[in-house]
């Protein structure tokens, strides 16, 4: 299958970097998303030489790092919006739904977060993804700890529950990748939530 070619007009370095990232995520979102994205393949899709790519990013590792940072910022904004629910239980449910819907709609992102898109890349990227999940766990933990102030009730172990919620997300990401995104997470979430809900009582 021929990769789509995008002609790049004269733009600032920052604009070109954003365009490279958009093409990269587009390749990861495609049916060939499980294939390794080489700089040759990426440069063809962008419509520039391999050498030109390195004018925008010093290495492919830096491209993926920028992409992971972008994913992190996007999800953080969604999570912050979900925290506005009236109580902790509803906030956690909204966050889980938001994260899983995002994963379903963005196969390339999910392949990065499960490590499948990074199998042949620098080990530093796997450490960066691990840091992403540590940050997610911290956000859950902070939200759970706020319950005592907001509702006058505390959990027995906020850290353990936060870790469980992150593990749940990771498991669903892997299930999506394993099914090649044929698994409909939205259809099954309410039943799964009924198993998580008792942890809030």
UniProtKB/Swiss-Prot annotation:
Mind telling me what this protein is named?
A: Nucleoid occlusion factor SlmA
Q: Which domain of life is it from?
A: Bacteria
Gene3D superfamilies, per this entry? Answer: Tetracycline Repressor, domain 2 (1.10.357.10)
Q: What is the lineage of its organism?
A: Bacteria, Pseudomonadati, Pseudomonadota, Gammaproteobacteria, Pasteurellales
UniProt family annotation: Belongs to the nucleoid occlusion factor SlmA family.
| Species name | Glaesserella parasuis serovar 5 (strain SH0165) (Haemophilus parasuis)
Output one GO MF annotation: sequence-specific DNA binding
Q: Does the keyword Cell division apply?
A: yes
Cellular component (GO) terms are: bacterial nucleoid; cytoplasm
Entry function: Required for nucleoid occlusion (NO) phenomenon, which prevents Z-ring formation and cell division over the nucleoid. Acts as a DNA-associated cell division inhibitor that binds simultaneously chromosomal DNA and FtsZ, and disrupts the assembly of FtsZ polymers. SlmA-DNA-binding sequences (SBS) are dispersed on non-Ter regions of the chromosome, preventing FtsZ polymerization at these regions.
**Subunit annotation:** Homodimer. Interacts with FtsZ.
Q: Which PANTHER family does the UniProt record give?
A: ACREF/ENVCD OPERON REPRESSOR-RELATED, ACREF_ENVCD OPERON REPRESSOR-RELATED
The record's DNA-binding region positions are: 38-57
Where found?
Answer: Cytoplasm, Nucleoid
Annotated keywords:
Cell cycle, Cell division, Cytoplasm, DNA-binding
ATP-binding is among the record's keywords? no
Among InterPro entries, the record links this protein to:
DNA-bd_HTH_TetR-type_CS (IPR023772), Homeodomain-like_sf (IPR009057), HTH-type_Tx_Regulator (IPR050624), HTH_TetR (IPR001647), NO_SlmA (IPR023769), SlmA-like_C (IPR054580)
- Give an example GO biological process: negative regulation of division septum assembly
Q: List the NCBIfam families hit by this protein, alphabetically.
A: PRK09480.1
Where in the numbering of this chain does the HTH tetR-type domain appear? 14-75
